[in-house]
Each structure stands twice: as structure tokens, then as C-alpha cells.
Amino acid sequence: MPTLTVAELVLDRRSDELISLPASASVAEAAAVMAEREVGAVLVMTEDGLVAGIFSERDLLVRVVAGGLDPKATTLSLVMTRDVKFVTPGTSSEAALALMHLHRFRHLLVIDGPRVHGLVSMRDLVLQMIKSGEGRYESAVRQARP
């Protein structure tokens, strides 16, 4: 089986599909965008267009809800994950998953030089690996059905 990379997940995405919000956006705005676009995280950008961090469902749960903060009055800059880990398109899916596991992240930034290609999620990587299983996934699903 060939080595799978994150390139197959992000390089074919159009750059306008990159979901990002300014650091000044409210948590409520971010939650609405995430729900509408059915994603678990968004990039948070500075006024200069640089990546400031990532805001994820986990940030919403741990920092906002458990912290008793008002989502409408709390900006992303206060609750986003700042220590953003990244991979390049050539990173293997296994290496990306290992990095996520090691640092307890569910999303990684994918960059190639100065270009941001997007975010890759643990779910994206697992689905990619399942689909590449040459029919084993479909067989397992058939066997699991009553």
C-alpha cells in the first residue's frame, strides 16, 4: 500500500474554502460559522493576514463553556489555541496522526512555504486511511451490520 500524505486532503481544496476568522471575532460568531460549514475548527487570523491560532470545538468546551465565559462577549484572541502545530503537504498521514496524538490536538495547520493550504483534522486522516484500505473497510461494515 502506498504511503498516504496530507497532500491528497488539502492540495485540491480551493484557497477560498479556507475557513478563517479575525482574532477580534466573537466566539458566538465562530460557533455559528463552524456549525454552518460543519467543521470542528477555524483558523484565527491577525489583521496582517497571518495565522494567530486555531479555534476548535475543544476550545469552545474547555475555555468558554467550562470557564463560564459569554460567547457573545468573548473574542477568539482570548480563547484560541496559540501553539499551532503544522505539517507540510508531503507529511505522511501516519506522521500527522502521531503528531496530533503526541500534542493532544485534533487539527493541524498545513503549510507549504509561506502558503497556508488549510487545516487537516484527525477525522480527515482516519477517513483517508480507511478509504485506502482496499475494500477492508467496506467488508468490516458489511460484517458489522445486523
Describe each PLM feature range.
Residues 1-146:
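Tandem CBS (Cystathionine beta-synthase) repeat/Bateman regulatory domains
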